Amino acid sequence: MEEQLIQAVEIASNPLANAGPDVTSQALQFLEHLKTITHESWSVGWSVWSARNPQDNGPKYSQNARMFGLMLVDDFLANRISLSTDPAAAVATLQQSAVEYIQNEYVAGSGDASVAYIKNKFAQVLAVLLLQTYNLPPPYTLLPTLLSMIRAHPAASPSQQSTLQLPINPLTTDLVLRVLHDLSVTLGSDVTLRAVRSKERLQRDAVIRDEIRANHASNIADSVWRIVEEGFNRVNQGEHASNPNSASGVRSMNFTNAVDLTAAATKIVEDYVSWIDINLVVTNQTVPLLFNVLHHPIPKIRTAAADALHGIVSKGMKPADKLSLAQALNLPQVITPLESRTRTGPSAQNGQSDTSDSNIEFREHLAHLTNGLVLEMCKILEESAAEESTRAAAEDLLNSLLPLVLAFLSDEYDDASEQTFSGVNMILSIYKKARRRGAELTGARAEFLSNLIGVALQKMRFDDEAEWPAGSFGAAEDDDDDDDEEDAKFLEMRRSLQTIVGAIAAIDDKLFSTSVAQLVLSTFASFETSSSDSDGQISWQQIELALYVIHFYGDVMTTATAAPKVGLSPAMFVQSPEAGSKGRAPKLGNEALAGLPLSNLGEMVQKLVQSNVSSFPHPAVQLQFFECLVRYSNFFAARSGCVLDALPAFLDWRGVHHEKLGVCKRVNYLLYRFVRDLRAVAAVPMDYVERLLQGLQDLLVVRAELPQVDADEDPLIKATAPAGYFDSQLYLFETSGILVSLLNNAPNDQVVLLKAISEPLSEQMRQAVQAFQRNPTDLTSVLQVHHLMLALSSLSKGFPDLSPTSTQPEPQWVGVFKSITEQVLVSIGAMNSFSVVREAARGAFARMVSTCGKAVLPYIPGLIDALLSEVTSAELVDFVNFLSLVVNKYKDDVRSIVDQLLLILVERIFFFLNQGVTGTDDAVEKSELQKAYMNLLSSMVQSGMESVFVSDKNVGQLETVLQSVVFYSTNSDAACQRTAFSILHRLVASWAGSSAVNGSTEATLPGFERFIYEHLVPLIFEAPAKDTFDFKDAQSQIVLTEISTLAKTIFQKRGDEMIQFLLEVYLPGINCPPQLAQDFTTNLTTLDSKAFKKYLDAFITRSRGG
């Protein structure tokens, strides 16, 4: 099998060199088979891995073959050892063979040619083997044997002389350190791995950790610290120091592997300190050594030392013990000079800024170490069981760390800053709890907060050399790629910093408010100075930061002052009067608000509007300016005069006429939001409306352009798929509609302005239809009609919806939209073969109905006539849902329309429902159409339109409709079943009349009594008796409620006649025992609906054998 394995690996590794694909396939199948039987194939795998070449005593086989063999051993030890016939013997054999291999390859050989991936895999297998040796009887010898090999050499074995007299063998030491690292990770120093392991695995690991702690931890710690010490000494000798053992057959470290081994051994300290005795790690000898390593300029070893110290300070300990450890280490005194010496940028020592990757990385590790100690001190402060003196000393130590926290948070590079976030948030949490207890922030805490908010706000600023990520602010060009990862990271950091600033505001809202106001107002002052001084300069980054801070100020303050439900109301912008006797400030009108002094936020927004900062020539500034106006649109309820300062910027080169298309797209939306919100607070100056519309006039032009397409692409679909400029242009039409709608007090002017916008568009639509009729291949005209329909419907969307119950005279502007609706009908009649036009027409019509109400209802039949012959199943769903909404809203007003349409509509619905299902998409569409159909029938019944079903036009289809409802009551999802049963019990209530026994003279719909007994009564029992009906499901319980309501409704309408039918016909027919049948009818007649539902549940469960 060994030769077969070698051949298979070589074939699989080089498929082009063999005879053909069949041979490769056979080789791969053979190798896969070996991987499934590693409890048998592991021995072959080990043989291939460890086989030696007799000529040079090196590995016999290729690296690929050896690695595959080792993978078989790894899988056996990790996953399949329990399948072995003798697991203990297999482990013992592997242990002995592994030691022999190390002697041959690492003590006497080349150490697997120092190939890192081979050494890593072998170390991983050794770690798993070491774990399995703990299932053998003690003593456990593999770990001590491995540690003894650290000083094993070709010419002097450990048995020949004291190993302490020998130097470290770099090859064996490297391997042993890799094994120790994998062993610690496997045993649980990696918290992530522990979180996903089984309880049994965790228990096994705990037993092995206890064994190592009791018998091997001291040896591990001593060996590792000696490696650190000897490796570091060799590093200090320099790169060109001579090797004293070069001729003795004893291997010694050179400079390169001394650096590697020192770093690796230091890393082991971090691995093991979390689960071995701290006294083995922290001693009078080891701490100075670790500090020396930390101060060494070589990046690899000093970052390892920083991580080791982080592991030490993060070790789980009692508060008093942790404090003693932290005080003994005195890390603030150690880290402070290192932080100062490694600074970059303007704050670098002596102007010497080291921006190398290694220095930046080291600062990140120092920040991580500082943050770790901060978290530990915070935990002591949070520990209620800790002595007061312990907490006081912990706060003193924490205070000594705060300058370091601020230094790293303000680092020029974000990675170091981000390391401090968790510690800063925990500090702020402690401060916040103290404030809740009534404690004042004084001394170090107050000073830290004051410094922290300044640092956090400045850290939010874009770098001087940064490019503005337009896409992240909704201003990407149509052909822009996504913003890169660095931009995303910065924006994520901004959000984290905003969380920190928000926490500060919750502790001291005055500090927050003052700090933000100072930043904002000083920036605006600098901008004004630079605008008037030709030599003055201010960067877009500075202004954008001020605007960004204004933008989030309101949200932070509403949360900090515990008033999120109030939100950014107009009262937020003024100094409101005191609350009344009920504890609430009075609600003020715009005139009252105008007479109150502005709040801090109001002052900033007013300064923003009046500063002309939007004229700064950078899109980031302009767009953030508009974002702020929209965020704080309620400000203009308090200072309506400022609207005239804000609106011009929207209309000129700074806004909707910006040179960058991406900015225009975003501003189109923001202008819509701004005008809509101003309407809500009655802050739009009426005499300014016409000027605004004139400013938008040149943009209210629709120009459809077909995109370039491949041979298999539909140009119309491609043109309407992406959210390009036209989609944002629709907001301008809606904005125009809002503006025109405000002129209700001048209806003639209102109609004139509305026609000025709409009539050119309607005329373009008419011309496009004519162009298409002359040339049916003219797809540009089709797309133009699509765009114009959407533009006109967006225009109508700006008007408030007319109430269906309104008794006011019809506004004059309704007539304009009726004309538009007529033009839409003409256009869809000519272009109904194009799905994009059908979709636009449906959308436009739905919008017109909402806006104009009853006035456009008579046009619905014309729309259906134009659509039905071409409509798809998905489109039909949309239209049926629309019709359901119309029925619910207008009820009797659309009775005649529904009567006229129902027959052809139901026929079209059945056409699609009767189609076969060929895939998942078809199944989903069919399900959606079922729901839409049921909802339409339900809307008709709930709106009192039962008579439509039995009108002269539709009565011939009644039986088919009823049968379809019965069908879907048991052959659809729960939501559809619920609707179906709801329809049925409402129809029973309307059409079932009453039996003479009940003393009523209500007439029964001819034939409906038969339908009840032939279909509905059996349905009460058959539907919940189905295997697919899950009584434990909440939706099914709702269906059962409707079923029980149907039963009770039939009884209420037919009385004893129903009881007689159940006892004499139906229940005997399904072999129901007489006593149980009598019990059912008794409960049906005596229980209310809620109680009967519970009984029906139990009855069906019992009948199903449950």
UniProtKB/Swiss-Prot annotation:
Residue ranges of the TM segments: none
Region named Disordered: 336-357
GO molecular function, one term: small GTPase binding
Entry-linked Pfam families: Exportin-T, Xpo1
Compartmental location: Nucleus; Cytoplasm
GO cellular component, one term: nuclear matrix
Record key words, sorted: Cytoplasm, Nucleus, RNA-binding, Transport, tRNA processing, tRNA-binding
Record InterPro entries: ARM-like, ARM-type_fold, Exportin-1/Importin-b-like, Exportin-T_C, XPOT
Comp. bias regions, Polar residues: 343-357
Listed GO biological process terms: tRNA processing; tRNA re-export from nucleus
Family: Belongs to the exportin family.
Role description: tRNA nucleus export receptor which facilitates tRNA translocation across the nuclear pore complex. Involved in pre-tRNA splicing, probably by affecting the interaction of pre-tRNA with splicing endonuclease.
The name this protein goes by in its record: Exportin-T
Organism: Mycosarcoma maydis (Corn smut fungus)
Protein encoded by which gene: LOS1
